[in-house]
From Swiss-Prot:
Source species of the chain: Arabidopsis thaliana (Mouse-ear cress)
GO cellular component, one term: vesicle
Factors inducing expression: Induced by elicitor peptides elf18 and flg22, by the fungus B.graminis hordei and by the bacterium P.syringae.
Function: Component of an exocyst subcomplex specifically involved in autophagy-related, Golgi-independent membrane traffic to the vacuole. Regulates autophagosome formation and autophagy-related Golgi-independent import into the vacuole. Involved in defense responses to pathogenic bacteria (e.g. P.syringae pv. maculicola).
Name recorded for this polypeptide: Exocyst complex component EXO70H1
UniProtKB keywords: Cytoplasm, Cytoplasmic vesicle, Membrane, Nucleus, Plant defense, Transport
Gene that produces this protein: EXO70H1
């Protein structure tokens, strides 16, 4: 509370805040007559202030000691503020014209009483109206500092005009906002009165103490703690992931609502003094906000692994999304450290994210798994790599910024030829990312080529490559990777897939294709029997071997079946139609001619499900006639 000791008006208890100079007030006439008249007016002002101010002396044993002036009567509160303003003007006059006047000593005493009352009112309003001054309510009134409805309500000389302004404001805002605006106006009026009278230090001290506790409490309720590096070294990654998710939610509320609301409130209450509001906001927010942005830096310093990249990118994206608010709220020099800490965290995160990308590439290159995928199916490295890359593609904004600063340290002309040239600013921004993704997939394809060599069967190698390239193409085509890599990339790799599929057909089925005569025109019965036996043997061998092959993708599976059937069935049908009648009198015809053309299609349709068929009654020369009938083969 303001002390009651006698003081010189110009020797403020707060050296930082000086009362306005006499020249800022109304000039007083210099003639003796006018001077005497003015002095009489000033002395009368002091006497008038005496009755108003002493009524609200916080140290007198009356009801006013326990009652809030601003809650009791807004009309009296306005009158009190005006009395303080007039008393200050009178003191300026008396100091300059009659420093020995007994009225000056009285005025000084009254000023001390008034400041004690305003100091008490300021604290009570701040403490008892936390609900009306919560950051969410304040931040909802983003333009309040420039809204005339809320300006100088307490300082208005015209009560009716002030009331009209409040009524006008009430038409466009909710009751909650109206109550909040009224409380803010009261605080502003008190702050301006105390600062103009040299009591800014006392006013600011109260404000800082109350509002800092609110900010600290708000962050604590959001789950923000005092962060220290040692805490992170002892925390497992699962717990840290949970902390990251909580921090992102808390930071969004903390910046967009808590700190923004505090900045708006501080700017409004201390709008008369830039230095005061900056100093206030620094004391209230700097420590808490700096601590808030230390969290991402500590996380970024932990062990770097590609598995941890996504939470790191979530942190990076969260800070980037908040950056406009950060710059707006912490724009002046006193709180520049907050922005500096946020920038440091961003840079540390970028380094960690890039390191995780490098780690991911290294894991692909160093994969030494030698176990062969049964049936030439999809390798787990392909699935895990493409799942990871497709997830990365959802963070194109974050990764584009990072990779723009870390271009691939190799000749990328070949890669860039696979990626569509950027035609817009956004595509230009993402071009480095597109090239990087193309590179990662190329690293995977090279590794798959190496793994394909481990198969002893060439046809199985090609089927393995086709299956794995198919899932790569499918993943690219159904995720944001498509926009990043472009249709040219897809077309080139689809052509490559067709080549793998074609090579598989040649390696797996060429013996069957070549088992029939190229020109089945004039064959003797003996020659026809040889070709039938050759075809059946080749088909049985190929079918039994290929029955264990697997093609998970339905589209590729059907395309392979159709392609094989088109090459095989028509030729066999023609051969069968022409030479079967020639062998009609042969004994054991069901053994010699074992397949009808229609049933070849049935056999082919059963392929690529990974169900192996071993030498059995189905393909045994000693099978009974009924067995072959059940398969749709020629009967005797």
């Amino acid at each position: 509370m303001a002390k009651m000791a006698k003081f010189s008006f110009f020797s403020s208890s707060s050296p930082k805040y000086h009362p306005s100079s006499p020249s800022s007030f109304t000039s007083f006439p210099a003639s003796p007559l006018n001077q005497n008249f003015t002095q009489a007016m000033m002395e009368e002002t002091v006497e008038t202030a005496d009755s108003v101010i002493r009524k609200w002396d916080p140290n007198t044993p009356s009801f006013t000691k326990i009652v809030s002036l601003f809650n009791h009567s807004r009309k009296e509160a306005k009158e009190f503020i005006r009395c303080v303003r007039d008393l200050r003007r009178a003191m300026h006059f008396l100091v300059s014209q009659d420093s020995q006047s007994p009225k000056l000593a009285l005025a000084q005493t009254l000023m001390q009483i008034a400041m004690a009352r305003l100091e008490k009112e300021f604290f009570q309003i701040l403490s008892s109206n936390r609900d009306k001054l919560d950051p969410e309510s304040v931040s909802g009134q983003s333009s309040i500092s420039s809204n005339s409805e809320f300006e100088d309500v307490m300082g208005s000389d015209d009560d009716d005009e002030s009331d009209n302004e409040m009524r006008k404001a009430g038409e466009s805002i909710t009751q909650v906002e109206k109550a909040s605006a009224m409380v803010m106006s009261d605080l502003k009026a008190i702050a301006e009165s105390m600062i103009s009278c040299g009591y800014g230090k006392e006013c600011v001290k109260i404000y800082k103490r109350v509002r800092k506790s609110i900010v600290d409490e708000g962050l604590s309720l959001l789950g923000i703690e005092i962060y220290k590096g040692s805490r992170f070294h002892r925390t497992d990654w699962v717990t840290l992931e949970h902390m990251i998710k909580n921090w992102i939610k808390a930071a969004k509320i903390g910046i967009a609502t808590l700190f923004r609301g505090e900045k708006l409130l501080c700017d409004h209450v201390f709008s008369a003094s830039n230095s005061t509001r900056e100093s206030c906001f620094y004391e209230i927010a700097n420590e808490a906000a700096t601590n808030l942005f230390k969290f991402p830096e500590f996380v970024a310093k932990e062990k770097k692994s590609h598995e941890r990249i996504f939470p790191l990118m979530d942190l990076q994206a969260a800070i980037s999304d908040l950056w406009q608010d950060i710059e707006m709220i912490f724009h002046f020099d006193a709180v520049a450290g907050v922005k500096s800490q946020a920038l440091t965290s961003l840079q540390k995160l970028k380094v960690s994210i890039h390191s995780a990308l490098t780690d991911f590439e290294s894991i692909i290159q160093k994969d030494t798994t030698k176990a062969l995928t049964p049936g030439g199916g999809i390798h787990k490295l392909t699935r895990s790599t493409m799942n990871f890359i497709s997830s990365l593609s959802k963070y194109s904004g974050v990764l584009s910024e990072i990779l723009a600063d870390h271009p691939l340290p190799r000749n990328t002309r070949l890669l860039e030829s696979y990626v569509r040239a950027p035609i817009s600013e956004d595509e230009q921004h993402n071009h480095a990312l597109s090239v990087h993704f193309a590179w990662l997939i190329l690293v995977l394809l090279c590794k798959l080529d190496t793994k394909a060599e481990h198969y002893k069967d060439v046809s199985l190698s090609y089927l393995f490559l086709a299956n794995n390239l198919q899932i790569i193409i499918e993943t690219v085509g159904s995720t944001p990777l498509r926009n990043l890599l472009g249709d040219d990339w897809l077309n080139k790799h689809e052509d490559k897939l067709c080549a793998y599929a074609g090579n598989y057909e040649i390696a797996a089925w060429s013996n069957v294709f070549m088992s029939l005569p190229e020109e089945p025109t004039d064959l003797s019965p003996e020659e026809a029997k040889i070709y039938f036996r050759r075809f059946h043997t080749a088909f049985e061998e190929a079918y039994m071997k290929q029955s264990s092959r697997v093609v998970p993708n339905a589209k590729l599976r059907d395309e392979l079946k159709v392609s094989i059937a088109k090459k095989l069935v028509p030729e066999y049908r023609e051969f069968y139609r022409k030479y079967l009648p020639m062998l009609g009198q042969e004994r054991n015809i069901e053994i010699l001619v074992r397949f009808k053309p229609d049933n070849l299609e049935n056999y082919i349709s059963d392929l690529f499900h990974g169900t192996p068929i071993h030498a059995s009654s189905s393909f045994s020369s000693s099978s009974s006639s009924s067995s072959w009938k059940s398969l749709g083969c020629v009967s005797g």
